[in-house]
């Protein structure tokens, strides 16, 4: 559930400040930002598209190749999972389920290739 409209400005200010100062890996940062943006829900319509656009922007500033990869298409193809991951994260009260889904989706774009900084996508998941 989105916060009341009078809190949106403060939440967005905090989110953008966090983005500017985050030391997390850009893949993780982009996913957390995307989730928090969706939670804040600053617009009446188009929040999903804007969240995905922000994620692409964050990733492409890290690795310009992301500006040309079909992140939006992959998420659209897995739309039910996308919304389920959002709901699961909302229920859990934290972004981990959504971050895990988005990282898996990003790995699906270029399965088996290195994204840099020692991160490698693979089909193997630890339990």
Annotate each language-model stretch with its function.
Residues 1-127:
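FIC/Doc superfamily catalytic core
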